[in-house]
């Protein structure tokens, strides 16, 4: 909710409609709650388990808007907590990432390969974090400004 509360009145609320992006239909509303319960129960103690959980959350797409951006942050938080790494998103090509995510419900080897090759142990590096946010918006088609150019952000 915090990420999008100033933009969408439905921010942080589980969606109440079926949604699709392009030709991909996300989890039907009638199965969404059980899908989220199953995701919550999934293990997350290894890189592979974390990515499998991330893929399932992408398929669930619990919100009407902001799923990709918020789940990439969620992914990094899980990786940081469980295995001591985060993704350096500046090393992940947009087209490769989007294609791998589109195919990931069938075969997750591509997304695992892409993300594993972009892992860094600089988990507390603010620059990597901010570049990750920039890339997250870039993946979604936003190009307005870079986080590093904002001067009024406080630690």
Protein language model features and the residues they cover:
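FIC/Doc superfamily catalytic core
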Residues: 1-155
């Amino acid at each position: 909710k915090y990420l999008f509360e100033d933009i969408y009145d439905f921010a942080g609320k589980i969606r109440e409609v079926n949604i699709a992006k392009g030709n991909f239909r996300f989890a039907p509303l009638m199965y969404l709650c059980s899908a989220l319960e199953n995701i919550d129960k999934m293990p997350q103690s290894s890189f592979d388990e974390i990515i499998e959980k991330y893929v399932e959350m992408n398929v669930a797409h619990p919100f009407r808007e902001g799923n990709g951006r918020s789940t990439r942050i969620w992914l990094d938080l899980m990786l940081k907590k469980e295995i001591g790494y985060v993704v350096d998103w500046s090393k992940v090509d947009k087209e490769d990432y989007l294609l791998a995510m589109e195919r990931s419900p069938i075969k997750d080897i591509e997304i695992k390969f892409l993300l594993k090759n972009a892992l860094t142990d600089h988990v507390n590096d603010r620059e990597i974090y901010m570049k990750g946010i920039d890339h997250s918006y870039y993946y979604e088609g936003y190009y307005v400004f870079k986080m590093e150019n904002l001067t009024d952000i406080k630690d």
